[in-house]
Amino acid sequence: METLNALASRRSVRTYTGQSLSASDLEKILKAANAAPVGMGLYDQMHLTVVNSHDFIVSADTATAVMMRTEGAHPTYNVPTIIFVSAKKQNPMLSGVMISSAAMVAHNMVLAATDLGLGACYLWGVLAAVSNTPALLAKLNLPEGYGLLAAVGVGPTAETYEAREIPADRISVSGIE
């Protein structure tokens, strides 16, 4: 798949087959994460945590549903793998750099999943719930001084990707000449 086609085809997938993510596909997704730009070259201050534990994902699902006041919902969408992006906590002047870098890492993983025909979805609610549930956060065993910044669910799906027309004016544009 070419880059522009992947961009036009990418969408949030919320249904998964129940199959595990293959080691080969995970390796490709992690390689895409490592290809992302990181502000000021601070790659050594970024960290990825791959969660394949069904028990952890169910606990995160429950915590997220409670936090969102939607008990009975499944905000992890039964995804088989969640990849958390964390970074070393920075002084406030640099925090935006790490947040932006984590977003780029997450987006690279989503685009790689799209290219591989896998489903992927940003899991912002899950990120918030895990970040605010000490028992779940501790299970991630993040490096000392690191905080969660992004979460991506990824796995096999029966859904297909179709390129869509992207309106050129979805985001307003201004300029200075």
Where are these regions (language model features)?
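Solvent-exposed alpha-helices and their adjacent loops that cap or buttress functional pockets
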Residues: 40-43, 74-77, 140-146, 164-165
